[in-house]
Each structure stands twice: as C-alpha cells, then as structure tokens.
Design a protein with these regions (language model features):
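Active-site proximal helix/loop that lines the substrate pocket
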Residues: 2-5, 44, 172
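Transmitter module of two-component histidine kinases
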Residues: 6-10, 36, 46
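Conserved AMP-binding/adenylation subdomain of ANL enzymes
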Residues: 18-35, 42-130, 163
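Short gly/Ser/Thr-rich phosphate-binding loop of adenylate-forming enzymes
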Residues: 114-162
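Short, surface-exposed connector motifs at secondary-structure boundaries
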Residues: 4-6, 33-35, 59, 133-140
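Conserved AMP-binding A3 loop
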Residues: 1-19
C-alpha cells in the first residue's frame, strides 16, 4: 500500500482477491471475448485484481504492454486493441490530459470560445468524443485508482462529462 503515503508491504488474504473479483462481476459488464490492455504492474493488487483476475475469469483477451506505458504507447495499444475496459492509475490519465488536451483548450482563442454557452457545449462534446476515440472508442468503463487523482484533471473530466470511475485501494 502507498496510495497516500510511503509504500509499505501489506499481506492480503485470499478472500480479498475473491471479494474484488466478485465485486467486479457484480458491477462491471465484461463478456467472454472482450479485450483489455494491461498496463499496470501485476505485483500491485490494483493491476492484478482489475486487469487480470477478473478479466481472466470472464474469458477476456488480455493484451500486455511490452514496454513502459508512455501516452504514445498506450494510445497505440488502445487504437489497435480497442479495449472494452480501461484500468489506469491517475498519473497515466493526468499525463494524457495535461500534455495532449489541456494545452489546446488554454489558447487565448479557445478560452474566449469556452465562455460562449452554445459553443462551449459543442467544444466539450467534441473534446469528449476525441478522448473516447483516443481511448479506443469501445470501452464500457474507465476506472482510475491506485493513487490520489489530480483535482484539475478530475474537474476537467467532469466538465466534459467523460465516463470514468475513481476506485480506492483495498489496503488503505
């Protein structure tokens, strides 16, 4: 565990793995044959439980990244695989938004356009659709967890009505 402080080893019983898998069966809607891009370390419970155990038990196809997950590599994988579920840590989502999306919206012209009600809605809808497409365009959910989420990025996702869920670690 180390979501909000220094890392520390935590012993987790079998029932914690089972309860997370059972929870995923109850709330996630994956089916056999759905595709997942696994980018989180399997040595961490978040990645193991929500990018492998649940998907494996459902019968999903799990694609493991063979390199460190940079935004470029992740988007390339999303484009090729078109995952049904995206499980990420906040840092990945934050890098993508801060480097690829926010700079375009912070230009002087865009700041003015975002103040005009009807145009504002169109811009937000366009940004949301572009982000959905960049994430493969096929996902049923984006789950963000394993660390604290940057408030600016979370507010942005809420503003554009991007479909995501924030999870919280079972060892906290």
């Amino acid at each position: 565990s180390g979501t909000t402080s220094y890392s520390k080893g935590v012993m987790l019983p079998y029932r914690s793995l089972w309860s997370n898998t059972k929870f995923a069966f109850e709330v996630l809607e994956l089916e056999a044959g759905d595709k997942i891009v696994s980018m989180l370390p399997m040595a961490h419970m978040y990645g193991l439980a929500f990018e492998f155990l649940y998907e494996f038990s459902v019968g999903c196809h799990i694609y493991f990244l063979t390199r460190m997950p940079s935004p470029k590599i992740i988007f390339q994988a999303f484009e090729e695989v078109k995952p049904s579920l995206i499980v990420a840590v906040p840092l990945i989502i934050e890098k993508i938004i801060k480097k690829s999306v926010l700079p375009k919206l912070e230009t002087p012209a865009m700041k003015i356009l975002l103040k005009v009600p009807i145009i504002n809605d169109k811009i937000k809808a366009t940004v949301r659709e572009e982000m959905i497409k960049a994430f493969g365009g096929n996902f049923k959910a984006v789950i963000v967890g394993g660390a604290a989420f940057n408030q600016e990025v979370e507010q942005f996702l809420k503003m554009i009505d991007f479909p995501y869920t924030v999870g919280y670690g079972m060892t906290e």
